[in-house]
Amino acid sequence: MAIRPLHDRVILKRAEQESKSAGGIVLTGSAAEKSTRGEVIAVGNGRILENGEVKALDVKVGDTVIFNDGYGVKTEKLDGEEVLILSESDILAIVE
């Protein structure tokens, strides 16, 4: 299934998170934190400015990003895989 986000929305695939603590203990369930890194798999056309112009997004498909996993992040299933839909403003950094 193809998906195209609107405006300043970005669709991410969450990166796999290590499930061991620094001391080597295997973490399960709620003890294992979800990663706040992801790969951009789709981007919208851009943010609509007050004057009506569209400003292109700073992130692009294939970027690895660090994001704020809080209010406003929507989780959906796409072809059996979990994806996240969020605004570009919820992205904190691009990993280079």
UniProtKB/Swiss-Prot annotation:
Subunit (UniProt): Heptamer of 7 subunits arranged in a ring. Interacts with the chaperonin GroEL.
Disulfide bonds listed in the record: none
The entry's keywords: Chaperone, Cytoplasm
Function in brief: Together with the chaperonin GroEL, plays an essential role in assisting protein folding. The GroEL-GroES system forms a nano-cage that allows encapsulation of the non-native substrate proteins and provides a physical environment optimized to promote and accelerate protein folding. GroES binds to the apical surface of the GroEL ring, thereby capping the opening of the GroEL channel.
UniProt KW Electron transport keyword: no
Alphabetized InterPro entries for the sequence: Chaperonin_GroES, Chaperonin_GroES_sf, Chaprnonin_Cpn10_CS, GroES-like_sf
Any single GO BP term: chaperone cofactor-dependent protein refolding
GO CC terms of this entry: cytoplasm
Family listed: Belongs to the GroES chaperonin family.
Subcellular location: Cytoplasm
Protein name: Co-chaperonin GroES
Source organism of the structure: Alteromonas mediterranea (strain DSM 17117 / CIP 110805 / LMG 28347 / Deep ecotype)
A molecular function (GO) term: protein-folding chaperone binding
UniProt key word Flavoprotein: no
HAMAP family, per the entry: CH10 (MF_00580)
A Pfam family reported for this protein in Swiss-Prot or TrEMBL: Cpn10
